[in-house]
Amino acid sequence: MLNERDFDLIFDSYDFKHEGKVHLSNFLPIINDLQLLHPASAPPLLSEFQKQCTLEFVRQNADLSITKDNFRDVYKKLTENEDDSFANQAEKPSMEQQNSKNSIKEDANEHSVNSAHSKSSSNASPESLNPSQMMSKRLSLPPMSQFTDSDFVNILRTPFAQSTPLNRNTSSRNTEMPLVRKDKPDFSNGHHDLIKQITELQDMLDKARDQARKKSRTVDILEGKVNELTHQLNMADSKYNESKVANNSQNNQIKTLKAQNLNIHKNFQKIQSELIQTNSGLYSTKKELSALQVRYATLLRKFTDQTKKIEELSLAASRSSENENTIRRLALENHELKNSNNQLNNHIDDLTREKHLIALSNNPKGDEFLSPSNLDEMVYSKEVGLSFTQPSVCISIPAVGMRESEELRELEFKCKQQKKTIEECKHISQSLQSSLTAESSRNKELVAGFLMLSEEIGIQKWIIQSLSKMSPTLNDFCRRYDSSMPTYEESSHECTVLSSFSDDETGLMATNTTMNNSSKDFMASQDTVNADNPHFLATKGQPLLLLSVMKSNILRLFYVLFLFACFYGLDYILCAELLQAFLRVVFTFCEHIIILLYGRYELVQPS
């Protein structure tokens, strides 16, 4: 053996199960593999006799296993080496060859001196014995002469030679000589030089046979290794092809995943840009909504003030209705007094005629004194009484005329005052009616504006919900939007509050049926705005209403275009965004123009 590393490698090659031990039948193949690693000039690790002894021992103990340490111990016992390593075996001199040469020389000398047959190697002295003979004596084994060539036929091969059948080189085996030489023939003393030549040739022949045997064995081992390596190479090639196919499939999957990742990243950037735009739009709508809320609060305050004024006017109207009743009662009394006055005048005329006739009958000469002019002065004078014969008549008539005239004056004064109050009440009712119509038109404008605002908020909410369905990352944004923005129910509640206020107005107007005959038209529904206030819709409300409707329709159209553009790339989305921004600018410009044309505070602008 060269070193411990080679021994460990060869031993592990026979340890198929990696148990740290091999079968005892693998002892000689391991020795042969180690021998192949030695140079050709190095002595063999085991002699033929030692190999034969080992083979017999293996046959007797075929079921045993041996470890590395046991392997070293057995080898030490066979070679009588006390060192722990096998590396020093190569440095020992080839004692076996020298002893064999010495024994041959000694045998030749003995034959030459005694002219008899040479002694057997078994009868030689201990000094002249070779290591194999000494080993046989020590182990009490039969000598090598008893073994023939047939005993060495079943020599174990290497595991490579056993595992794969190889084309063996039989040319050297056909000329193979027996491993153990037979007993040397006796030579005469005259053939000493010939014996030397024969021994040298025999040694050369043995070396050549050993080298040929080693070469054939190395060829067998190498062929087995080549076959095993070709088998492993084929397996590795198949595995390489499989791994190549798997790698190609994995590369294709990686490419598809990269493409999907790029698409997802692009979609994420698109959605992020859309979110930023929607966030900016929502921020602007929030600002507009806050401004509308402030304006709504101010309008609500004004509306409450107007309702208070309307209540006061309704109280005044109720009082004026009471005054009208008193006026009617006083007018009836005046009419009755006029009738009574006429009756009294007729009665006075009758009395004057009777007295005139009486005076004519009593004083026929007093025509001048009793002329009609004098009689009239006497009758209609309120300070001087008539000189009648009957004093009761002369006293009672002037008194009745004075009372009636005073009452008539008082009644005329009261009638004038009542007429003035009636005219004032009519004027107040007309102003109240005009203010109520103006407030009702403004309330209708507010209701229409808030309805359009709620509709646009609902559209924006629907767009955001649909976008959130497309991307799950928008759910938190939708929740924040729902919590921050007023819902459609709140806006509808505001509209119902406004409609309730308008209903209260109509109820207040309906109480004064005598002063406002057009309250039935104001009690109509909000769908008949054109019939209630056609001037407003013709001049102010109709452009703003058409603009808001157009705006909501274009928002729906842009949402459909956005969904269509999501499937055809980024260029369509950029064009749609630019067009949408341009139209927003145009709509805001139109709104500002409408505000400047029709007044800033007369129109309610939807967001």
From Swiss-Prot:
<dbReference type="GO" id="GO:1990612">
    <property type="term" value="C:Sad1-Kms1 LINC complex"/>
</dbReference>
<keyword id="KW-0963">Cytoplasm</keyword>
<keyword id="KW-0469">Meiosis</keyword>
<dbReference type="GO" id="GO:0044732">
    <property type="term" value="C:mitotic spindle pole body"/>
</dbReference>
<dbReference type="GO" id="GO:0034993">
    <property type="term" value="C:meiotic nuclear membrane microtubule tethering complex"/>
</dbReference>
<dbReference type="GO" id="GO:0005737">
    <property type="term" value="C:cytoplasm"/>
</dbReference>
<feature type="region of interest" description="Disordered">
    <location>
        <begin position="83"/>
        <end position="135"/>
    </location>
</feature>
<dbReference type="InterPro" id="IPR011992">
    <property type="entry name" value="EF-hand-dom_pair"/>
</dbReference>
<dbReference type="GO" id="GO:0045141">
    <property type="term" value="P:meiotic telomere clustering"/>
</dbReference>
<comment type="function">
    <text>Has a role in karyogamy, recombination and segregation during meiosis. Although it has been shown to associate with the spindle pole body it is unlikely to be involved in its formation or maintenance.</text>
</comment>
<protein>
    <recommendedName>
        <fullName>Karyogamy meiotic segregation protein 1</fullName>
    </recommendedName>
</protein>
<comment type="subunit">
    <text>Interacts with mcp1 and sad1.</text>
</comment>
<dbReference type="GO" id="GO:0031021">
    <property type="term" value="C:interphase microtubule organizing center"/>
</dbReference>
<dbReference type="GO" id="GO:1990683">
    <property type="term" value="P:DNA double-strand break attachment to nuclear envelope"/>
</dbReference>
<dbReference type="GO" id="GO:0031965">
    <property type="term" value="C:nuclear membrane"/>
</dbReference>
<dbReference type="GO" id="GO:0051301">
    <property type="term" value="P:cell division"/>
</dbReference>
<keyword id="KW-0132">Cell division</keyword>
<keyword id="KW-0206">Cytoskeleton</keyword>
<keyword id="KW-0131">Cell cycle</keyword>
<feature type="compositionally biased region" description="Low complexity">
    <location>
        <begin position="111"/>
        <end position="132"/>
    </location>
</feature>
